[in-house]
């Protein structure tokens, strides 16, 4: 639990009665989002650690560049949300474990780093520069979230052209975490109360996980690409 989640936990009144209110249920969903995020990363991390990568095709290994990009973007989002007091267990778990997976990727991963991923890091740096210049976290957070939604493109294309590289269980858990995170947005039913600090991260993560879930569970199984089509996607 982080930021307002801790405040709500220690400041709750009525215990079980409070948890039965809409605000209490939203708090529960935010906690569930963090737990599901942890489970998803655990599944993914276990695959990375337990696989004998010396026997696997090189292009199936985790990418150092990819995980550096995810770690940089998500830690930036976490820092900005901490500064605004809106960080949740979901983004805290995601940012922290992405750094750990990046460190593991340094050991077993490939050196690939796509143009899109480099662009995402640049967008994130622009966001940091805007914060330093303007003294406002909103532009920086928006840039980091835009970079996050764009950062899934290389992973999506790779899985579309070469199915089987992504773990379905992990992505299913990530998607469930995102759904809980969106339900837990403070003031969800009152759009006038939405802020960049509360809304941008859950929606950005949902776009990322939703696109991958659609690919893994619908597009690839029901509409597989031919060899020529895969080659065109890879190109």
Residue ranges and their predicted role:
Residues 2-235:
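Alpha-helical membrane-protein topology signature
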